[in-house]
A protein has these predicted regions:
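A conserved SF2-helicase RecA2
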Residues: 175-195, 204, 208, 334-383
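Conserved RecA-like P-loop NTPase helicase motor core
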Residues: 116-123, 139, 272-364
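Conserved strand-helix element at the start of the C-terminal RecA-like helicase core
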Residues: 45, 54, 69-81, 216-263, ...
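Conserved helicase ATPase core of P-loop NTP-dependent helicases/translocases
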Residues: 82, 96-109, 252-302
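Conserved interdomain linker/interface between the two RecA-like ATPase lobes of SF2 helicase motors
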Residues: 174-249, 368
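Conserved pre-motif I regulatory segment
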Residues: 2-46
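Post-DEXD/H (motif II) to motif III coupling segment of the RecA-like Helicase ATP-binding lobe
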Residues: 135-195
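Walker A/P-loop
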Residues: 37-61, 246, 270, 295
Length: 383
């Protein structure tokens, strides 16, 4: 059995060399402490938006490679594979193989394998000492099957919102190096303001799998007054900020994109079926100011590091995970903007609270068939 006390040997020196931020060093220290107890083999790092979880993962991988161990890093979507590889290479990790059909970086012998959960579901999973699961709250079946079958492997989960039902039945422990409030206070995340011009009436919308029915929610949000309010509020208060908009479903998000275009605002639409080339083009146009409002449903809730200073939330939800993920897309500090402006047309901030007030200290241990108190399962991206 691998000696977990020495798995990350040399991390203190690496932390100084790479100038990790204090909360990143603390994340590695807490992880070492948890795994060092002996009984914990599956540990989640609760890593708020902006904590730098990819860099933290890089240091974990470096420590594992120093001991001659193989690592699998799983991403929640194929679209995130290349940026993950680039991030690892930027920190000096070169022995990387990508598990994806016809990918130029395919190398089964590489010590570090990067794969999407969709690919893992169709492939034989290679041997590894450590599996790092990004966005582990999404609870991919292939990962959880591996967790129950591979008792010789250590699993490290990464998530800003590890609050999904039943996670505590699979994972042994969760460590929390910092909170969103901590990162805002220390200047690593942006201050934010919330303006809620509309509170949609959701009383007649049924609940499915712990969240509002998507189609019924879209009907509520497609009302003429609400549709007009979204555009008018941004024109009055949005200050022409680079903006991400979240719609209730694809049709609703497309309608809002068209409404912004009619108002003379450069807009783009992106969903799970937008190919990687078009998505890269949208990102480039967004970064250089050619697109002011990028509309989606859930595609842009994770793995997006765009220079956003306004969030339009037009998608009511009961999910604190989804709520925090959406607002988190705009909390990174951007040059030239003082804060994040949240235009909440969904009533989510009033219903669920401000993201600085939402926090969990333990993993949920709700048994199958029982109702979790306040959380629905977030959907995996379609790829």
């Amino acid at each position: 059995m691998m000696d977990m006390l020495h798995l990350f040997e040399g991390q203190e020196a690496l932390a100084k060399k790479k100038e990790l931020r204090p909360h990143q060093v603390r994340a590695i220290d807490l992880l070492k402490q948890s795994l060092g107890k002996g009984k914990n083999r599956k540990v989640v790092i609760q890593a708020p938006t902006g904590m730098g979880k990819t860099l933290t993962a890089t240091k974990i991988i470096e420590g594992a490679l120093e001991k001659g161990n193989r690592v699998i890093f799983t991403a929640p979507a194929i679209s995130l594979i290349d940026q993950t590889v680039s991030a690892f290479e930027a920190e000096g990790i070169r022995d990387i193989g990508v598990m994806q059909a016809q990918h130029p970086r395919t190398d089964a012998q590489a010590k570090v394998q990067v794969a999407s959960v969709q690919t893992l579901a169709r492939r034989e999973i290679p041997e590894a000492a450590i599996v790092i699961v990004d966005e582990c709250h999404l609870r991919a079946k292939v990962i959880e099957k591996m967790m129950t079958e591979r008792e010789d492997v250590f699993f490290i989960g990464l998530s800003a919102t590890p609050w999904a039902k039943g996670m505590g039945l699979l994972w042994d422990d969760m460590v929390t190096p910092c909170t969103i409030g901590d990162l805002i206070e220390k200047g690593y995340l942006s201050q934010f303001r919330v303006f809620a011009p509309d509170i949609p009436d959701m009383s007649g919308v049924k609940t499915v799998a712990g969240d509002y029915h998507e189609g019924e929610t879209a009907k509520v949000m497609e009302g003429k007054a609400l549709m007009a309010s979204v555009v008018e509020t941004w024109l009055e208060r949005g200050e022409d900020r680079p903006t991400l908009l979240f719609g209730a479903n694809c049709a609703h998000a497309k309608q809002l994109a068209e409404s912004f275009e009619r108002a003379g605002v450069a807009t783009a639409y992106c969903d799970a079926y937008t190919d990687s080339v078009e998505r890269a083009l949208i990102e480039r146009r967004f970064r250089n100011g050619e697109v002011r409002v990028a509309c989606s449903v859930r595609t842009l809730t994770t793995g997006v590091d765009w220079p956003v200073s306004c969030i339009i939330d037009a998608a009511p939800t009961k999910s604190i995970m989804l709520h925090v993920q959406k607002i988190g897309r705009g909390l990174r500090v951007n040059e030239g903007t003082e804060d994040l402006l949240v235009l909440d047309h969904a009533g989510n901030s009033l219903r669920l609270g401000l993201v600085t007030d939402i926090h969990r200290d333990t993993l949920d241990k709700t048994e199958p068939g029982q109702k979790q108190q306040s959380e629905g399962k977030e959907k995996l991206p379609k790829e």
